[in-house]
């Protein structure tokens, strides 16, 4: 970032606001005192500056505008959404500003790295290698920040202090990661440097690796125990920082490393809300693929969709609405389960069968009881009038006289018998027909229940098969994940081994160069001594 600023000539930094004067109008007059009095204005008479114009200006001018004009920078802060700013000043200037007069011999040698090894060893004997300068920097800080791996290795071999903090509470490891000095980072990690120490902004070495999109360094830090959920003072985890800075590749990397997708910043915002506020549709889509919570609210009570609507991010609105529709379809399909419906119908049918079985014996028992009651009434009347024919009614006596000299009760009994016998015959026929109907119903219901039970059994078998398949797939996925982790670890170890080989080669080459230089120095000394001797001899001859 600093390289981009420093690479621009000084003249262009003065011309830039005047070139934009015709477009910026009164906003430029309000923000930049250098543009006042120019007399040019294309903005309305109100004189109020437009925040949307400032955003478009920042997007066009980029980091140049933020560095040259503090009013555009917002005191080192980048706006996200309608409220809640994040301080980006921690990432502005990664390298140290060094003045020669502020450093002693050891610190100069560590910073410049152009001192022979023998001289460094002598310096380390004479002075304290953990000594600090005015900004509380040790020799290890300066060597790591400037990428002088030889000095770093020498200090590590001498067992210097690894986790000393400078004036911004940064360790040598943080400075090496911040300045993207990979060799020094690996050397420090191998010697036990702590990757979870936070600087004054709350950032760890992993935060700076994510900001720089350095996946190799992020892998190495995680391999050596860096905390993937560490939060800085803005409440940003490495994942939230990657989303905020729209670093899609490192966001993918952190998702694979199982970073918490529901982590909240100090304003209660999730990664999805941050991605929506930044207007990054690709990161929003990436997070939606991980089934994140769309309905979560921040401290202001707003959701991701509300931010998308207020910011007029139409593509993101479509993505969120499509995701909600898919989720609703899943929920409806889970609620309307056909297997559960089959179970309910089978239970209802079994209950109906039980009720019909209980009702049929009651009918069977009621009909013979009615016949018994009728027979009892007839027998009682016969007993009453059998011995006393005078007490009979008139219609009965008339019937007796007309009955061929027989008693009056005999024809009456004869006439009553067939009447009493006709009713049971019809009742028996109806009873038998009802019984046949009931048996047919029972058979049909039993057949239906048998069919439904077969269907339930088949459905259960299918469920068991699906569950077995899911279990097998989960086992295979877990096995694949383990294999992937082992491969990643082996890859990292191979990369570290390669870097170690490169370091050894560079050491060997530097040693050879030092030996050659020493030989040249000795040869030069010998030549000088010879010339001095020759000159002395010549002087003695001339004097004689």
Swiss-Prot record:
Biased composition (Basic and acidic residues): 340-355, 364-375
InterPro entries linked: Ankyrin_repeat_domain (IPR050657), Ankyrin_rpt (IPR002110), Ankyrin_rpt-contain_sf (IPR036770), CC144C-like_CC_dom (IPR039497)
Claim: Repeat is one of the keywords in the record: yes
Superkingdom of origin: Eukaryota
Region Disordered, annotated ranges: 332-457
ANK repeats: 135-167, 168-200, 201-233, 234-266, 267-299
UniProt keywords, alphabetically: ANK repeat, Coiled coil, Repeat
Residue ranges crossing the lipid bilayer per the database entry: none
Coiled coil: 457-538
A Pfam family per the record: Ank_2
Bias type Polar residues, positions: 439-457
Family named by the database record: Belongs to the POTE family.
Name of the protein in question: POTE ankyrin domain family member B
Species classification: Eukaryota, Metazoa, Chordata, Craniata, Vertebrata
Gene: POTEB
């Amino acid at each position: 970032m600093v390289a981009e600023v420093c690479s621009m000539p000084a003249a262009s930094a003065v011309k830039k606001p005047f070139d934009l004067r015709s477009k910026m109008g009164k906003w430029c007059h309000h923000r930049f005192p250098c543009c006042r009095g120019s007399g040019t204005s294309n903005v309305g008479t109100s004189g109020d500056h437009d925040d949307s114009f400032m955003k478009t200006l920042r997007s066009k001018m980029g980091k140049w505008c933020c560095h040259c004009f503090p009013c555009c920078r917002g005191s080192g802060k980048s706006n996200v959404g309608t409220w809640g700013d994040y301080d980006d000043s921690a990432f502005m200037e990664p390298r140290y500003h060094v003045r020669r007069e502020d450093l002693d011999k050891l610190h100069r040698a560590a910073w410049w790295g152009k001192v022979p090894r023998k001289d460094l060893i002598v310096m380390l004997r004479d002075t304290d290698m953990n000594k600090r300068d005015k900004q509380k920097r040790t020799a290890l800080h300066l060597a790591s920040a400037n990428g002088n791996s030889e000095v770093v290795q020498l200090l590590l071999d001498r067992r210097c202090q690894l986790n000393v903090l400078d004036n911004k509470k940064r360790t040598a490891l943080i400075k090496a990661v911040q300045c993207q000095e990979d060799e020094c980072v690996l050397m420090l990690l191998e010697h036990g440097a702590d990757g979870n120490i936070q600087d004054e902004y709350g950032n760890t070495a992993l935060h700076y690796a994510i900001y720089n999109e350095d996946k190799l360094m992020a892998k190495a830090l995680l391999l050596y125990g860096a905390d993937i959920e560490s939060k800085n003072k803005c409440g940003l985890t490495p994942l939230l920082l990657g989303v905020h800075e729209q670093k899609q590749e490192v966001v993918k990397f952190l998702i694979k490393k199982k970073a918490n997708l529901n982590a909240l910043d100090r304003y209660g915002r999730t990664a999805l809300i941050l991605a929506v506020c930044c207007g990054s549709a690709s990161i929003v889509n990436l997070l939606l693929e991980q089934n994140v919570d769309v309905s979560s609210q921040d401290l202001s009570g707003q959701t991701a969709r509300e931010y998308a609507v207020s910011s007029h991010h139409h593509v993101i609105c479509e993505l969120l609405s499509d995701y909600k529709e898919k989720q609703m379809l899943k929920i409806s399909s889970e609620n309307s389960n056909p297997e559960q419906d089959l179970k309910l119908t089978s239970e209802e049918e079994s209950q109906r069968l039980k009720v019909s079985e209980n009702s049929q014996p009651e009918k069977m028992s009621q009909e013979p009881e009615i016949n018994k009651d009728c027979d009892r009434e007839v027998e009682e009347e016969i007993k009453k009038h059998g011995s006393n024919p005078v007490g009979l009614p008139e219609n009965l006596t008339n019937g007796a006289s007309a009955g061929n000299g027989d008693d009056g009760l005999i024809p009456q009994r004869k006439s009553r018998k067939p009447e009493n016998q006709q009713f049971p015959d019809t009742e028996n026929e109806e009873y038998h027909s009802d019984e046949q109907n009931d048996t047919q119903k029972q058979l049909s219901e039993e057949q239906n229940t048998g069919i439904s039970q077969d269907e339930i059994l088949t459905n259960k078998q299918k469920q068991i098969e699906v569950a077995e398949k899911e279990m097998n797939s989960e086992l295979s996925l877990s096995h694949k994940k383990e294999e992937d982790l082992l491969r990643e670890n082996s890859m990292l170890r191979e990369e570290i081994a390669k870097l170690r080989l490169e370091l050894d080669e560079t050491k060997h080459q530097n040693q050879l160069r030092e030996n050659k230089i020493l030989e040249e120095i000795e040869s030069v000394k010998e030549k000088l001594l010879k010339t001095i001797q020759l000159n002395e001899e010549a002087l003695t001859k001339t004097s004689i």
